[in-house]
Amino acid sequence: MILENACDYKGYLASVFDELGFYGSFEVVGDNIELNIIPKDNSETPTKEQVLEKLKEIMLKAKKQELEAQINAICKEKIVKDFRSSVLGNLHAYDLTLEDQANLQALVIANIDSVFRCAEVNNDGVVGNKTYKNHTKAQILKLSQEALKFKQSLIIFYGREKERLSAITSLEALEKFVIKEYLI
């Protein structure tokens, strides 16, 4: 069986062999894939159309998973690196790793003044060096509320991007999919 202009699918052939229930081998010749199919358990040999459809289905699923992982990584990076607040009077950048979030929540619960790591952001948007700066308990509470709102906004935005991705049902539509940028 020859699959014309199908060389882009070669990485997904092993999965097709498994899912359609056959053994065999393949060779890429130019843009074509030449398949040698051996059915398992006396089953019927799949048609070229069945093989191509299954290839597209598997490739679509794999590419959607890759894009979803990219969306998750973008969201996580923005949560960790892009949070800004003016609770200290002027704009400061704060990290929001899980540890930072836990520490912030612990300070809110303790209801105490404390130092918290942040960096001043100048008028050009350049972030200085992070240092531990004094925060009142009111500033810590406000910072926590702003951080939660920021994180929630990102999660909702990128969750909607994953919903857009999930609705895609063809490779053609997937090729046109571009992850939108969250603008603060």
Spans of features found by a protein language model:
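A preference for well-ordered globular domain cores
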Residues: M1-I184
